[in-house]
């Protein structure tokens, strides 16, 4: 999946890429733990799906924080994905939802080889805000988080045994770093 040289990446392609890159690692760890712990196949599968969904939410949260996070809390410079033209959920949806004028400006910034870092980050962030990418990303993060909770709820153990995983997922979604 070579996205870095394309401006026409579909959201579904990106979600599949981050599922394979990030989500399955967490999902597999949860499923292996479930199997080793003697869980039923159904519970192991539900824990896998829980991990997959929370992994998607986590990666989208990472994309979001790279644009809207607080540098002091995030631990790295904001806008790194913007300056490197990384195809994130944010940029992909900006291209897919922009009007002609906004798209042309995005293309100019993505194709620019010389630029002032702060100016590029500010301009692309402004475009994201105009297009509504900030709200779109937050809605998608919440969607995957809600889906993860559905799968965790299906695991057939007492709620108190799932509480730690639920709390961990909640902390992941409220993180600012």
Q: Which residue stretches match the model-derived regions?
A:
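All-alpha prenyltransferase/terpene-synthase fold signal
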Residues: 1-177
């Amino acid at each position: 999946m070579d996205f870095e040289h394309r401006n026409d990446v579909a959201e579904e392609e990106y979600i599949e890429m981050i599922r394979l890159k990030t989500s399955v690692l967490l999902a597999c760890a949860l499923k292996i733990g479930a199997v080793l712990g003697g869980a039923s196949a159904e519970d192991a599968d539900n824990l896998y799906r829980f991990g997959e969904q929370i992994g998607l939410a986590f990666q989208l949260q990472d994309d979001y924080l790279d644009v809207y996070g607080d540098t002091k809390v995030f631990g790295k410079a904001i806008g790194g994905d913007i300056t490197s033209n990384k195809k994130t959920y944010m940029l992909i949806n900006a291209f897919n939802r922009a009007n002609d004028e906004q798209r042309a400006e995005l293309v100019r910034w993505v194709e620019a080889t010389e630029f002032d870092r702060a100016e590029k980050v500010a301009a692309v962030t402004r475009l994201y805000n105009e297009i509504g990418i900030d709200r779109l990303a937050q809605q998608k993060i919440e969607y995957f988080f809600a889906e993860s909770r559905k799968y965790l709820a299906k695991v057939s153990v007492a709620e108190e045994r799932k509480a730690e995983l639920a709390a961990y997922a909640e902390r992941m979604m409220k993180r600012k770093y």
